[in-house]
Amino acid sequence: MTTDSAKDSRTMDFLLVTGLSGAGLSTAAKVLEDLGWYVADNLPPELISRMVGLSLTSDPPVDRLAVVIDVRSRLFTGDLGWVLTELEAEPIHTRVLYLEASDDVLIRRFEQVRRSHPLQNDGIDGTLSEGIAAERRQLAVVKAAADLVIDTSALKAHQLRQKIETAFGNDANRTMKVTVQSFGFKYGLPMDADLVCDVRFLPNPHWIPELRPHTGQDADVRDYVLSREGAEDYLDTYRHLVDLTIAGYRREGKRYMTIAVGCTGGKHRSVAMSEALARRLGSEDDISVSIVHRDLGRE
C-alpha cells in the first residue's frame, strides 16, 4: 500500500473494494457514489490499470476512482498482487477496502433474497455453506492486504454508510444539503418535500394594495411578513424542529432534505418565510442551503 507521506505527490485516490458475496458490496458502491467517487462495478482485474489510465487522462480528470470486485471477477491471490504492483507505477494513492460477515449472517441474507451463492452458480460447490467457505479461501490473501476490513454482520445499512463516510469521505461529503422550497397550496403540495410547513396563519400581503404587486423577495413585503406577530417565534421554533430532523437524518445516513414552505399562492408569505428560514439554516458550517421558489411568477 502507498504510505501517507507518498500520497501528497499522487494525483488520484484509487480504492479497490472487495469482499465476500452478501457482505454489502452493493451498498458500499452506492455510498461511495454518494460521496463523489467514480465507481466501476465488477471490473475484470486485467482492465483495472486501463481504467486508471483513462481516469487520469480524462478531461476533467477523475479525482477519486473506486473499483468494486467480487468473486465473479475471479480476483485470485496472484491477480491481486499483479494489479497492485502495476498500479504502484501510476500517480495514485491506492487503498483496499474488504467487507466480510459471519457465515450465519451471510446464509440468512442469501436466504432472505432467495438467491444462491455465485460459486454455487458455477457448480464449484454444491451448498451455500460450501460456497461461502470456498470464497473465504479464495479471498484470504485479499483480506490480508486490505487497508480496512469492515465486518458487516451486526451493521445496518446506515451504520455501514457511516463507517465508509468516515473512512473515505471528506468534510464536503458530510454536509447536509437542504433545499428550502416556497410554494402555493392552490397549486398542490411539492411531491419531493420531506417537511411541509404552512405559513397561512400570517396576514396576507395580497390584501394590501401597495404590497400586492410585490413578492416576498422585496424588502417591503419581507419586512411586513416578518414583523407580523408570531412570525419570528415560528421561525425559531421551526428551526429547532429542523435541527432535530437533520440530526436524525445524519444518524440514518441521509444527506439531503427538502423543506416546503407554503402559503396560498406562493408569492408573498411563503417566499419571505422560506428565505428567512434559509438564512437561519445557512449560518451552520455543516449545512448547505439552496432556495427554490416553485410558484413565484405564476400569478
Swiss-Prot record:
Residues given in the record as GTP binding sites: 70-73
Entry keyword set: ATP-binding, GTP-binding, Nucleotide-binding
Highest taxon listed in the record's lineage: Bacteria
DNA-binding keyword on record: no
MF-aspect GO terms: ATP binding; GTP binding
Any Pfam family hit: PapZ_C
Binding sites annotated in the UniProt record for ATP: 19-26
Listed transmembrane segments: none
Family: Belongs to the RapZ-like family.
Function: Displays ATPase and GTPase activities.
This protein's name: Nucleotide-binding protein RER_30260
Lineage of producing organism: Bacteria, Bacillati, Actinomycetota, Actinomycetes, Mycobacteriales
